[in-house]
Regions:
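Hydrophobic core segments of transmembrane alpha-helices in multi-pass, intramembrane catalytic enzymes
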Residues: 44, 48, 174-177, 281, ...
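Membrane-interface alpha helices of multi-pass inner-membrane proteins
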Residues: 156, 338, 350-365
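Perimembrane helix-loop-helix junctions
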Residues: 338, 371-402
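Membrane-embedded, hydrophobic transmembrane alpha-helices
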Residues: 1-192
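Transmembrane helix irregularities
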Residues: 264-265, 295, 311, 359-367, ...
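Transmembrane-lumen/periplasm boundary regions of multi-pass, lipid-linked membrane glycan transferases
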Residues: 226-229, 387, 399-414
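Active-site lumenal/periplasmic loops and adjacent helix-entry segments of GT-C-fold
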Residues: 161-167, 184-330
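Membrane-interface transmembrane helices that cradle and orient dolichyl/undecaprenyl
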Residues: 332-349
């Protein structure tokens, strides 16, 4: 079980980016293929994960491996996905494209970008996909498939509850979710890091998806505002939304992100607002687990995350209704994981931290302000301790990038 769960492959020398290039081809094919659940899943995951994984591997070729690298790549990929869409939406009208955030223009942009990234992988002999998969036994895939079952049961249970008022399957899904949380603590010393993280991630998705999928309407006190802004972006097919003075319209997590998922992957807006927050919250919990595991060990970290999941009302009942905050919280947890990793090359980590700061700034204003304040305080604390700058990730330029991005985007651009 431990071998199946550990996600720390060694980098293979002499590769020519074969696995990564093949993965880019699969994503490109899924983009142009007729809409189906399989194609939607592959294209959605691939558009965010593959570019982020390649860029992360090029910037930090060593020091960060396995699941930590996968989470970091997801954060970088979300940031890139948002900024590419924003650039396309803003520049397109000046090139004569009236609706640049519609399917055909976005397909052209992303197919060209995917081809360029695949070429970079070949030229630089970078194969992050191959590195990630190297040395993993087949039973790892079985664990991944098994842990995907409880979230699916949660969706089936919600559907049955909506249609027949029977809560049998929904109750079973809840029991499974709580059981996974318990297993992550009870068996923390007998399973590997990856499997423990898998238990936590599957549990969060299973429990969170139980709430917004029930009933025939979107759920949440602020969901009307989020939905209207996202729908206006999709209707306009461009960014910024013409003649809009709504501050929410400046958040790429509510405008460009759902618009691209809708047009590129044929995913309905309601589906995006219902399912994506649960996945992001699961990623937050997993990232938190891996970050504090270095300090508290497998049992202490699992217990603390379990308390976060089942002991915090807002985590399961309030945050799933705030997609913009879920995006920002995930990026912030990745920043904390990144700056607290003692194995990562410090200078290159500073670059990735600054990039994630940009992603925070365009995702959620309040989280961006608080994150910037936390980074500035941490930088000042490092000065008080007189730690040499070469040993500090949060230097003055990094702190300035967080604060500057939050202030400029929140107060000027938006």
């Amino acid at each position: 079980v431990t071998e199946a769960a550990d996600l720390g492959p060694q980098r293979a020398e002499g590769r020519f980016g074969i696995a990564t290039t093949f993965a880019f081809i699969i994503v490109a094919v899924s983009l142009v293929a007729p809409a189906s659940p399989g194609a939607q899943l592959v294209s959605t995951v691939g558009l965010i994960l593959l570019p982020g994984l390649l860029l992360t591997s090029l910037i930090v070729p060593w020091g960060i491996t396995g699941l930590r690298k996968l989470l970091l790549a997801t954060g970088i990929g979300i940031t890139l996905f948002c900024f590419v869409g924003a650039a396309a939406g803003a520049i397109g009208p000046y090139l004569g494209v009236s609706r640049p955030l519609s399917r055909v223009p976005l397909l052209v942009v992303w197919l060209v970008l995917l081809a360029m990234l695949a070429a970079v992988a070949v030229v630089r002999r970078a194969d992050p996909v191959g590195d990630l998969l190297a040395g993993h036994p087949r039973r790892s895939l079985w664990w991944i498939a098994a842990l995907a079952v409880p979230p699916c049961i949660a969706l089936v249970g919600a559907t049955e509850l909506n249609a027949t008022s029977s809560n049998t399957i929904a109750t079973a899904a809840t029991v499974l979710g709580l059981g996974l949380v318990f297993a992550s603590v009870a068996f923390s010393r007998r399973i590997g890091e990856g499997l423990q993280a898998g238990f936590v991630g599957s549990a969060v998705v299973t429990l969170v998806w139980q709430i917004p999928t029930r009933g025939g309407w979107l759920w949440g006190w602020d969901i009307q505002h989020e939905f209207s802004v996202a729908a206006a972006t999709i209707a306009a097919g461009r960014f910024p939304i013409p003649h809009s003075h709504d501050p929410y319209a400046g958040m790429l997590s509510l405008t460009v992100l759902p618009a691209q998922l809708h047009f590129l992957n044929a995913i309905q807006l309601r589906t995006i607002l219902v399912l994506v927050p649960g996945v992001l919250l699961a990623a937050c919990a997993v990232t938190t687990l891996l970050t504090i595991r270095r300090i508290l060990g497998p049992t202490g970290s699992a217990l603390l995350v379990a308390l976060l999941i089942v002991g915090t009302t807002s985590f399961l009942t309030e945050l799933p209704a705030l997609m913009r905050q879920c995006v920002a919280l995930f990026l912030f947890t990745v920043v904390i994981q990144l700056v607290s990793d003692p194995t990562a090359p410090i200078r290159r980590v500073r670059v990735l931290a600054a990039v994630l700061g940009l992603g925070l700034a365009v995702s959620h204003y309040s989280t961006a302000y608080m994150s910037a304040a936390a980074v500035v305080v941490a930088w000042l604390f490092g000065l008080v301790l007189r730690a040499h700058w070469s040993r500090r990730v949060l230097t003055a330029p990094v702190a300035a990038s967080f604060a500057g991005a939050a202030l400029i985007w929140g107060l000027v651009v938006a």
